[in-house]
Amino acid sequence: MAANVGDQRAADWSSQYSMVTGNSRENGMETPMHENPEWEKARQALASISKAGATSSSKASSSGPVASAQYVSQAEASALQQQQQQYYQWYQQYNYAYPYSYYYPMSMYQSYGSPSQYGMASSYGSATAQQPSAPQHQGTLNQPPVPGMDESMAYQASPQQLPAAQPPQPSNSQHGTHSLSNGPQPGTAPSTQHSQAGAPTGQAYGPHSYSEPAKPKKGQQLWTRMKPAPGTGGLKFNIQKRPFAVTSQSFSSNSEGQHSSFGPQPNSENTQNRSGPSGRGNLSGKPDDWPQDMKEYVERCFTACESEEDKDRTEKLLKEVLQARLQDGSAYTIDWSREPLPGLTREPVAESPKKKRWEAPSSLHPSRGAGSVTRGGGAQSQRGTPGAGGAGRARGSSFTKFGNRNVFMKDNSSSSSTDSRSRSSSRSPTRHFRRSDSHSDSDSSYSGNECHPVGRRNPPPKGRGGRGAHMDRGRGRAQRGKRHDLAPTKRSRKKMAALECEDPERELKKQKRAARFQHGHSRRLRLEPLVLQMSNLESSGADPDWQELQIVGTCPDITKHYLRLTCAPDPSTVRPVAVLKKSLCMVKSHWKEKQDYAFACEQMKSIRQDLTVQGIRTEFTVEVYETHARIALEKGDHEEFNQCQTQLKSLYAENLAGNVGEFTAYRILYYIFTKNSGDITTELAYLTREMKADPCVAHALALRAAWALGNYHRFFRLYCHAPCMSGYLVDKFADRERKAALKAMIKTYVALHSAAFCAVALPRPLRILVSLQLLCWSPLPVPCS
């Protein structure tokens, strides 16, 4: 009955599933199951096997290729299927027939003798033996125990011979392809080929023995006994495993004589460096491995140093010398007791160009950052910096310190970044000022934000206020009761100086700061006048500098409308000097005849514009501005008068002939009108003796004195006798002074004052009225004026 059931089950499964040949089962690799020509023979053998088929099948596995396929009974298959569902139920949703081999190197190659992926027959017979090629090797893999299975199950591989006509296997990497199966067959799809491409470059894999005796199997393998679930057909997902990261450590063969297929063998170069005496001189070696006389030589070098600068130079020289000696192996052969000490010169060592943070440090020529690291770590730890025990002791145990210096630091970016993170993330209550191990020469090579120079220039940052505002945010309880002294004493300054980070470029920075004050005042005078470009006229109120745009006009028109320039002037619209003289004569005659101020002012401004555009500053220019000032003064336009008298002042400063005295007096009177005492004082200071003798200037000075003293009687007497056109300017502020005079007279009136004396400050129509009002109070007759 069991044979019939097994025969029926084998007949049902033969049309759906493939089988695993003896080769793939021997190697322990999982291959897709396809229909085999030997299936009919195996089915007939299974029908004749009783319940002890497991024992007979194990005996038949060594007889030939017909009995190489092993099967289990129906009861055992169902029990294994239940066990699979119990332990590997997570992977059944992907129709994965076998347990997910995360930790088991499963092969994706098909074995010889089985049909290809697309049902094509293999070109190699199943009974043909294979001989692995030179770069390929295989070995016994020690698999961890599978849950629920016997721990003593063996996983062995048997050597087979390849035919002579086999094509060579291509290699996808620079080292040998690690074939975990008997090799891919030619008909296999490219997706089923696998190569160890994740191994690091430069690792050599030694040959393994292929004559290793096979161990007797203690039980059938899990992937041999387990069958796919019914209904899944030939579907199978090749889920890629996580890449196996091969480290640089060498896995030696175990004591049982089994060879590991993953263990990289050390290359000959590394072996020589480790074995010979020169191998001890490797740059990554510790100073503890140095010869004793070499250590004494380093101590003598640092003992001879007198200052920190000497130690810096000695440290740099020793690094270059000792690294070269350790590299060529002469450090263990020379007599260090007779080796001369490196010469120390007082000149500062030329600074090497700064290196970027992301540049890898050179092994033969260490950068300046390495030296700064040793000073930051070694010197401070020996000086007794508080709180420098954690990282300082850790580094002190790895390197031997000579004269407050670590002569060698291993240029390892990974270790330096780890040390920097560990130091910056420490929660010690005191602030450590220590450089990080990042080998860069920049000024910001401190560990995080922890290293700030302590002193008067950089006080500690203040908080927002309130309780604990003097503390740094994020510190522990041990610092809450402490306050930062704003004015440190002499003793505290010495302690702070010991905590300061030593900057290797301190002297260079001092020289740069001193160089800024060697050339006197840093402000330099502008060599050329600041010119406003025409294409960048953003401020509409500022006039362009016409000195850079001097042109010669060609316009013959005597009259021209005044238009404000918004672009470069056109010579065809500008009148030359000859035409401008005719235009000035026309404006004078027109003003005398018609007194049309609007026309006269427009034409005078147009003439001034043409003179400015052409850069003409001659006596004719002075005449134009004086004429326009007189017309504006006569009409009472003090704005235009102010513009004209300002230009006349600059023209007179160029020693151009004109009515200098007259317009100087007008300027003084204009300052009295605006009550600009500062400009009045300046103008009086620049008056010469000859200028003061001018009648107009003398009158203006007398009027200014009466106005300043509040002598209104004298002020109005001078106002009545104003020369030239000074009266037009006094008219602008005469009413203001009359009111002030009346207030003064009302406050200080005495009957002894005559009406005629008081009437002087009044205009002529009011003199009679005031005289009549004052007659009733005055005992004396009023004299006729």
Swiss-Prot record:
Extent of Low complexity compositional bias: 47-64, 413-428
Species in which this protein is naturally found: Mus musculus (Mouse)
Comp. bias (Polar residues): 13-26, 119-143, 175-198, 246-276
Region (Disordered): 1-64, 119-292, 336-507
Biased composition (Basic and acidic residues): 32-43
Entry-annotated residues carrying Phosphoserine: S352
Subunit and interaction comment: May be part of a SEM1-containing complex.
Keywords in alphabetical order: Acetylation, Phosphoprotein
Gene3D superfamilies, per database record: 1.25.40.990
InterPro entries noted in UniProt: PCI_dom (IPR000717), SAC3/GANP/THP3 (IPR045107), SAC3/GANP/THP3_conserved (IPR005062)
UniProt superkingdom: Eukaryota
Name of this chain's protein: Leukocyte receptor cluster member 8 homolog
N-acetylalanine PTM positions: A2
Pfam families hit by this protein: SAC3_GANP
PCI domain boundaries: 637-785
